Each structure stands twice: as structure tokens, then as C-alpha cells.
Amino acid sequence: MHRPPFSDQNAVKIYRRNLTHWRQEGATYFITFRLADALPKRITEQWESEKSLCLAARGISKASANWQSDVESKLSKKEQFEFRREFNRKLNHHLDRAHGACHFRTDPALATLQEKLLEDDRTHYYLGDFILMPNHVHLLLNLIKGLDLERTRQKIKGGFAFLVNKAIKRSGKLWQREYYDHLVRDAKELIAFRNYIQENPNKAGIRLPDHSYREAEWLTEALANHHES
């Protein structure tokens, strides 16, 4: 099962909504899901305003329907990387402030999500490392052949939401509609994401139960095999 994170030889599909998403069969993804109240409206509005000002300074209007294409055509690869890194950093900083109800701070919501993620491992995906933060989730996963990320995402966000809501006796929207995914390009990126997942609670200054974090042995083995080859 030690498939490479990304292959230059295989086809890549790209589509856009609020974010740009890359897809490739057999690849590994870093994914972030956020609880519906994880980011207060004033923070998301400020974040979007800062993005708009940053792009406007580079001659790109975020009001344009094609602004993401403009980013790719007008900015160098390095500028694109730095832009995305900076605004992802700002967003994650706000997430780590633990806004909202923070259902995953304690059981039963935390245990329900963790158990279901592990239960579906190797039937719907190959589950890599994960960290269940109080109001968001970071995880690495590799898709089983024939399954795409959209269907897998729908199962995690839809089916898991039902179980978590049931466990904590609530109803209504659990997750934010938009989510973040990144197709892991190489072993260096994979190591960086694994380190980020492991270090997230300490850097955020949040103490979590042990079962909030999981390190996947198959990823460790895959990296070891990669270094030996």
C-alpha cells in the first residue's frame, strides 16, 4: 500500500470553489475540517478583507469571478506559495484560539469522531496521522482505489456529523461547508504535515486527551521505504 504521495506521471484534476483543489488517484491528502462556529464572522470577514487588499496591491481583484486564475497567471510560483502560506497561517492561528463550542475538547464527541475515523480505516480510506483539536480536525489520508475525495469527504462530514450530534444530544449544522485539502507533493511535504499535526496542540497551548492524536505506522513505514529506495 506504500503508494507515492504524488506522481508527476499521473493525471491531475483541478477544480475551484472558494479554494483551489487538486485531485490525483492514489495520492495522499492533508485535510482540515472546521466546526461551524470555529471562526466568528468578524474574523472571517477580516481575513477575507486582508486577502483582498493583499491581492489588490498586486493588481488582482478578488471581486472578479476569475480571481484564482488571475493569481496563477499574474503571480510567480514563489509568490503564490507565500500568499497561500501566509493566509493559511493566519487562519490556523485563529482556529487555535479555540473559538466556539469546541465540541471535540472532551468526550463523548471526541471519542465518537475518533472511533468512527478508525472504524472506516481501510474500508473507505487509508487513515494517516490525525489530531482532533477542540474546534477543528487535521488529518492525512490516502484514498482507496475507485473512491474519490468528494465522496469520502461527504461521508466524513455527513455521516460523522449525525453520530457526533447524536452523542452530544444536539441537532443542526456541525461542520463549516468549506474545508481545506492539500495534495501532498513529496516526502518532504508529508514529513512537514506530520510534524504540524503532532505539534499543533503544544503550539496552540492546548492540553488534549491522548486519543486526540494518532500516528499512523503505515506512513512511518512508507517514509522509511522511500528513504531506502
Describe these PLM feature segments.
Residues 1-229:
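Short catalytic/metal-binding and nucleic-acid-binding patches
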